[in-house]
From Swiss-Prot:
Annotated localization: Nucleus
A Pfam family that the UniProt record links to this protein: GCD14
Enzyme class: transferase
Record-linked InterPro entries: SAM-dependent_MTases_sf (IPR029063), TRM61_C (IPR049470), tRNA_MeTrfase_Gcd14 (IPR014816)
Function: Catalytic subunit of tRNA (adenine-N(1)-)-methyltransferase, which catalyzes the formation of N(1)-methyladenine at position 58 (m1A58) in initiator methionyl-tRNA. Catalytic subunit of mRNA N(1)-methyltransferase complex, which mediates methylation of adenosine residues at the N(1) position of a small subset of mRNAs: N(1) methylation takes place in tRNA T-loop-like structures of mRNAs and is only present at low stoichiometries.
Organism (species): Bos taurus (Bovine)
Record's protein name: tRNA (adenine(58)-N(1))-methyltransferase catalytic subunit TRMT61A
Stated family: Belongs to the class I-like SAM-binding methyltransferase superfamily. TRM61 family.
Positions contributing to S-adenosyl-L-methionine binding: L87, S114, G115, S116, E135, R140, D163, V164, D181
Catalytic activity as recorded in UniProt: adenosine(58) in tRNA + S-adenosyl-L-methionine = N(1)-methyladenosine(58) in tRNA + S-adenosyl-L-homocysteine + H(+); an adenosine in mRNA + S-adenosyl-L-methionine = an N(1)-methyladenosine in mRNA + S-adenosyl-L-homocysteine + H(+)
Residues reported to bind substrate: T274
Region: Substrate, residue numbers: 20-22, 35-42, 64-65, 85-89, 110-117, 180-183, 205-212
Length: 285
């Protein structure tokens, strides 16, 4: 099992996502002899998981069933153990596009946190790229390093435990893109400039408050970055249904009493503010 490449059969040591129905999911580490309790009954790893294909429908102890899904960065984001606040797939998709990430890209990131963005970046830049991720908190850095090895993506990532605002990313002039998710990104802008390639690259920072964005933009402009822009992603879900309205009688011949048509109306409850994504470009020179 790898978050980068699909594998058909479940093996010991794999991470599997159990879909329990109605949107409920849980991530489990598959171990021989282990058991997982679900609302549908017990799931025995040796009998019910190991050797089965990913995507299998497995019957639990009480007669209920679950689907065993292959892990992806998107599913991991929804099921990971939270060590910090995380970014979700909507923001991750935008920053991946705006940073122009592709296989072979070299990326510098801070902070690692729970690894939500890290897994998505690794999947995008593999098999020839590399991620340099910096985490200030020692225990979070150690746990992230362990997870990358468990998920078999360790070859594409280097984890450093240091303060990026003081010590930088540990590399110079190698990165195609830099991503910051830290409380004071403006203090790391200079290190981001040094980490990016001499021929240029892309920068992104995530901040929940507009005051953080203002200070970051000032630092970016002072450092020489150009093409500054700040975006906020607010998805709007629409409810589409068929409705019928009465048709007025406008002539001598009788017509239909009502006519159906498709109507789309926005849902009353939508996802609110998560944060601002600020982008900039380091140009050659």
């Amino acid at each position: 099992m790898s978050f980068v490449a699909y594998e058909e059969l479940i093996k010991e040591g794999d991470t599997a996502i159990l879909s329990l129905g109605h949107g409920a999911m849980v991530a489990v580490r598959v171990q021989r002899g282990a058991q997982t309790q679900t609302r549908h009954g017990v799931l025995r790893h040796s009998v019910d998981l190991i050797g089965r294909p990913f995507g299998s429908k497995v019957t639990c102890g009480r007669g209920g069933w679950v689907y065993v899904l292959h892990p992806t960065p998107e599913l991991w984001t929804l099921n990971l153990p939270h060590r910090t606040q995380i970014l979700y797939s909507t923001d991750i998709a935008l920053l991946t596009m705006m940073l122009e990430l592709r296989p072979g890209s070299v990326v510098c990131e801070s902070g690692t946190g729970s690894g939500s963005v890290s897994h998505a970046i690794i999947r995008t830049i593999a098999p020839t790229g590399h991620l340099h991720t910096v985490e200030f908190h020692q225990q979070r850095a150690e746990r992230a390093r362990e997870e990358f090895q468990e998920h078999r993506v360790g070859r594409w990532v280097t984890v450093l435990n240091q303060d990026v605002c003081r010590s930088g990313f540990g590399v110079s002039h190698v990165a195609d893109a830099v991503f910051l998710d830290i409380p004071s990104p403006w203090e790391a802008v200079g290190h981001a400039w040094d980490a990016l390639k001499v021929e240029g690259g892309r920068f992104c920072s995530f901040s929940p408050c507009i005051e953080q964005v203002q200070r970051t933009c000032q630092a970016l402009a002072a450092c020489g970055f150009s093409e500054l822009s700040t975006l906020e992603v607010l998805p709007q879900v629409y409810n589409v249904r068929t409705v019928s309205l009465p048709v007025p009688d406008l002539g001598a011949r009788p017509g239909p009493d009502a006519a159906p048509f498709r109507s789309g109306t926005p849902m009353k409850e939508t996802v609110g503010h998560t944060g601002y994504l600020t982008f900039a470009t380091k140009t050659p020179g």
